[in-house]
Every structure is written in structure tokens, then in C-alpha cells.
Amino acid sequence: MIAFLSAGIALGLYAGFSPGPLLALVISQTIKHGPKEGVKVALAPIMTDFPILLVSTTLLIRLSDYKMILGIVSILGALFLVYLAYGSIKTRGVEVNIDQEGPYSFIKGAIVNALSPSPYVFWITIGAPTIIKGLAESYIAPLLFVGSFLGCLVGSKCLLAVIAGKSKHFLTGRPYFYIMRALGIVLLAFAFVLFKDGLRLLK
């Protein structure tokens, strides 16, 4: 149980703090319209991730008798985590483009997240295999994983919206870089676990 909760927290924090289109939109909406609009953008994954999560998990459950497929998916997930960890350790901050359009923050956030490849790759290669592994132990394990992941993802982006509303320099300062490097190291640890699970399924 603790392992699934820990995985959800670590991956959620990474997804929340890492530079990308959604975080850039959170910051730009905050700068233009205030923290409240940035928080609205941050809430978008609650709506957009659930359909991706359900489809990915349902598909892999139907293929669960084919352990080789799950093994390959898990190894691909581990490689994706290594890629994310590298990007996290080497991060240089967040680039933000400012325009003067109306807020429409939640809608913009939902569109940006739905059109980004990252949620699809994450849930297919990392999220869904973790949920299926959790279901083998208890129905509570996947709920802990998904709940902690989305809670930390949305919560950290909301926190960044509030911080950006008070200090626009945080996302280019040392504390942010240290956070991202620490999260990168944690991701490498989870990549090792996922890779080991993949090899076990291939046997």
C-alpha cells in the first residue's frame, strides 16, 4: 500500500513541478489574470486524465493474460521514466509566453492537457501497469496511487500558481532547480522498479 501511495506522490509532484505546456499556461494565466485563474488551469487534469486513465487501464486489463505485452509496456514505461528523470535533472526553468486574450482558464487548461502527448504516454506505460499491479493486491492500492498522483499533480500546480502570483522569479531560481533534481533522482528509482517488474513479466 505504502509503495503505491509513495509512487503516486512522487510521480504527481514531478508532473506538477515539471516544465511543460500546462505549467507554462498556469504561470501565464497567473501573471495576466491573477492566481485564481492559474489555479483553474491547474485543475484541468482532473477532467482530462480520467478518460485516458480508464481507457488505458481497461485495454491493458484485457491484455493482462499476455504477460509479454505487459512486460514490454512496463519496460517502455521505465525507459520513459529515465527520460523524464534526465529532463528533470537538467531543467533550466519555465518559459512563459504572455498574450492578452480573455481568461477561459479551465477550458484552455483542458485543451492543452488533452492535446499534450505526455498524459497518454504516462497512463499507458506507467499509470495503467501500476494500477493493474495494485489490483492484484487490493482495490485500495490503485485508489491510493491515482488519488495521490492527481492530488499532488494538481496541488503542486496550484501552489506554483500562488507562488508565481507573489514572486515571478521562483521558477528560474535555485530552489526550483533543486526540487526538480531531487524529483529526477526519485524517478530513476521508480524506473528501476518498473524495469524489474517488466523483466519479471517477460520470463
Please report, for each region that a protein language model flagged, where it lies by residue:
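Helical-face signature of the major facilitator-like transporter fold
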Residues: 8, 12, 105, 109, ...
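Hydrophobic/aromatic residues within the transmembrane alpha-helices of Major Facilitator Superfamily
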Residues: 9, 13, 17, 50, ...
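Hydrophobic/aromatic residues in alpha-helical transmembrane segments
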Residues: 22-26, 85, 123-127, 147, ...
